Regions:
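N-terminal hydrophobic/helix-forming segments and targeting peptides
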Residues: 6, 12-457
Length: 457
């Protein structure tokens, strides 16, 4: 059950709908995802994905078993802002063998072995020539790096440095059975309509191959969130985008400029399955989503860090570009490029932890409830404190919980700040208590006829 809901605000700001006075406290069970996140990641992990191609379609097909996903295909060459949709890439096999037929590197064993978007090749190459197309990690000699060449007419292999150091033959037979041809780029979209036209935009990238944290963790968590939101009617709509990184976000923005004024809040999800602390990267201009995320993380019981916006990272770069400047932040645990498993074969099913996935899901669920329930109230008569005792709202023992889940102090904070100027989030931040407790206090005061709803924040 949701934490609560304001009166709906119509398209032009008028109040509409009826009060929804629902239970304010949420049990631990309510914060559990409706699917096994770790198992879902495990199902998607073996699939080879890139900006385009069969792997993305297969992945979105798995997501589509859980939500009614709209699949969009955008043709190769389509102009999108300053870019064009690239050629479609598909790969069937790739190997490096000795001349006597011994297979040393096989794409079938790990899809990180081939540089993404490698063009087809078949021939015998000298070691020196092959060295220019081999990517390794000398500081992590047993790991396979993840590399791409999306917009380069090139090919390459990625392998453990220890393996490469032992490859001392003069020549090797190389085969990459791939094709780059006109086709399309695929992305998925799922909209849960709200009572108003205003929306929360939630996105993740779906273009990485067998990397569990970056970003199958985001794909799985976003799928579970979409399932959860589809089962409830909120004040806000929720638009979930499963996109190839960069070009996918740019394409969606180019095709949807006319509706961007609906986006009230936005969140990019990535790297949410490791055991590290939460990191929230703020939007470019500062927005309610930034304050809301900081508040939820402060009260979630886990270490966290708030990071200022910078123009490098994930698709928040596109949503926050100056021509759009949407209120979109990014939530992650491990920050790109800062943990040793990043973009290596160590980002595997052992690296992501089921408990971290569930805690990430729970924090985001609380954030969505906050955004949907963030309203502004005003006292009917703000002169002095109202008499709580005759309304059954007074407790002589300091700190004792009222029936609706708020303490007496929560109720006093709410009644003092219910001046038509402070939203529930403003109140929760100032009182330094979880949002749900101020929302519970609002429900009690509204039930008692002490306040009226002024606006939904």
């Amino acid at each position: 059950m949701r934490l609560g809901r304001c009166l709906a605000i119509g398209t032009f700001g008028e109040l509409s709908g009826r009060k929804m006075l629902v239970k304010s406290e949420t049990s631990a069970v309510d914060r559990l995802p409706g699917i096994d996140l770790y198992d879902l990641i495990g199902e998607m992990f073996p699939i080879n994905r890139s900006l385009t191609g069969a792997g993305v379609r297969k992945t979105l097909g798995i997501v589509g078993r859980h939500i009614d996903l709209d699949i969009h295909e955008v043709a190769t060459g389509t102009a999108v802002l300053d870019w064009h949709v690239p050629m479609e890439w598909n790969i069937r096999s790739a190997t490096i063998k000795t001349l006597d037929g011994k297979c040393l590197v096989d794409f079938a064993e790990n899809n990180l072995h081939v540089m993404g978007y490698s063009k087809p090749v078949n021939g015998v190459f000298g070691r020196a020539e092959l060295a220019r197309r081999v990517h390794t990690l000398p500081d992590q000699p047993d790991l396979i790096p993840y590399r791409t060449g999306y917009y380069a007419d090139d090919w390459g292999f990625c392998l453990p440095h220890s393996l490469w150091q032992g490859m001392n033959d003069e020549h090797y037979r190389v085969d990459i059975d791939s094709d780059l041809s006109p086709g399309s780029m695929t992305y998925g979209e799922f909209l849960v309509p709200g009572e108003t036209r205003r929306e929360v935009l939630i996105t993740c990238h779906v273009c990485h191959p067998s990397l569990a944290n970056d970003n199958l963790s985001g794909v799985a968590i976003m799928t579970a969130l979409a399932m959860r939101q589809s089962e409830r009617r909120g004040r806000l709509g929720y638009r979930f985008l499963f996109l190839p990184a960069t070009i996918g976000a740019i394409t969606w923005l180019a095709r949807n400029e006319a509706m961007l004024d609906r986006i009230e809040h936005g969140l990019v999800l990535t790297c949410l399955g490791d055991s590290g602390p939460f990191h929230y990267k703020q939007s470019r201009k500062g927005a309610t989503i930034d304050r809301a995320a900081a508040h939820v993380l402060k009260h979630c019981g886990e270490p966290h860090e708030i990071m200022p916006f910078n123009p490098y990272g994930y698709d928040e770069r596109q949503f926050c570009s100056p021509g759009f400047d949407l209120p979109v932040g990014c939530l992650m645990r491990g920050v790109h490029g800062t943990f040793p498993e990043y973009h290596t074969s160590a980002d595997n099913m052992d690296f992501v932890k089921p408990e971290a996935l569930v805690r990430s899901y729970s924090a985001i669920e609380a954030l969505l409830d906050l955004l949907d329930g963030n309203c502004t109230y005003q006292r009917g008569d703000g002169r002095g404190e109202p008499q709580l005792g005759r309304r059954g709202l007074y407790r002589a023992i300091a700190g004792q919980r009222e029936a609706g889940g708020a303490t007496q102090m929560d109720l006093l904070w709410f009644l003092n700040l219910a001046d038509g100027q402070h939203s529930l989030l403003d109140m929760a931040i100032r009182a330094d208590v979880p949002f749900a407790r101020l929302e519970a206090a609002a429900r009690l005061a509204l039930d008692a006829g002490l306040v009226r709803l002024v606006a939904a924040a």
